[in-house]
Amino acid sequence: ETTLRNIEWTPTRFGEIAPVGVFDSVEIDGCSVSRATLHNLTFIKELELVPGCRISVSKRNMIIPHIEENLERGHYVDAVPPVCPCCGSQTRIYQRKGNDGRLIETVHCDNPNCDSQIRKRFTHFVGKKAMNIEGLSETTLEKFLTLGYLQTFPDIYHLNEHQEEILQLEGFFLMFI
């Protein structure tokens, strides 16, 4: 049992703005836990989750933190972010059928130029499940995107054109193997 302190909203690479519950740290199975996915808007509405409510938290499959229930229902106030927390574009609620046939509501940012979405698309592209390019962390990608070295995926393969500038950045050096 703990207190939900905040709901953070973060855009995914597809534009869905994913909610995460931040709560007072609790120990479950020897691990300190203070965050759990809230999945979608439907989950938040069904549990009537609002900051300040008392919640019950468990671990699913002995690993994944999960908010099981709201112990103080009846105080729900719709708190959908009106704008994307990253780019400020207006949000939209989408409805789709879940695997069980129930209607699921999700919050989306429809801005294709949202920095967070772009960064996450690049992070996925270089990741193990896609191109498996080692050495390009999300932080490095964000730096290269900000500096304009990356605009499209093929730009990754032409970073050598910016070698002199990159070597001037803190933490970058030339390595010979």
How does the language model describe each region?
Residues E1-I177:
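RNA/tRNA-interacting regions in translation and RNA-turnover enzymes
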